[in-house]
From Swiss-Prot:
InterPro entries: Asp/Glu-ADT_sf_sub_c (IPR036113), GatC (IPR003837). GO terms for biological process: glutaminyl-tRNAGln biosynthesis via transamidation; regulation of translational fidelity; translation. Pfam families: GatC (PF02686). This is Aspartyl/glutamyl-tRNA(Asn/Gln) amidotransferase subunit C. Gene3D superfamilies: Glu-tRNAGln amidotransferase C subunit, N-terminal domain. The gene is gatC.
Length: 99
């Protein structure tokens, strides 16, 4: 017995505001029946002894310790900038005057 009937597919199509032809109704009924069959098979797997998890991989902390390293001086950072004004990067204006 199919898990979903052609009438149920037509009802879902109406709810979704989809206009389906008779051939499409038959096609989608078969496809949805196959999908629901696979879901039913998966739900029958005995997973009572498997703990719930958000990820199949073990979660480990992959961060490294913070170490202080010297950074660029303002002059070094601005040296490669195409335009500088008052020790700041100059960029094209993207908003109007009043915005």
């Amino acid at each position: 017995m199919p898990a979903i009937s052609r009438d149920e597919v037509a009802h879902l199509a109406r709810l979704s505001r989809l206009a389906l032809s008779d051939a499409e109704l038959d096609q989608f009924a078969g496809q949805l029946d196959s999908i629901l069959s696979h879901v039913r098979t998966i739900s029958e797997v005995a997973a009572a002894d498997v703990p719930a998890t958000a990820s199949p991989d073990p979660v480990t902390n992959v961060t490294r310790p913070d170490t202080v390293v010297p950074g660029l001086t303002p002059d070094q950072a601005l040296a490669a900038a195409p335009a500088v004004e008052e020790q700041r990067f100059m960029v094209p204006q993207i908003l109007g005057e009043g915005e």
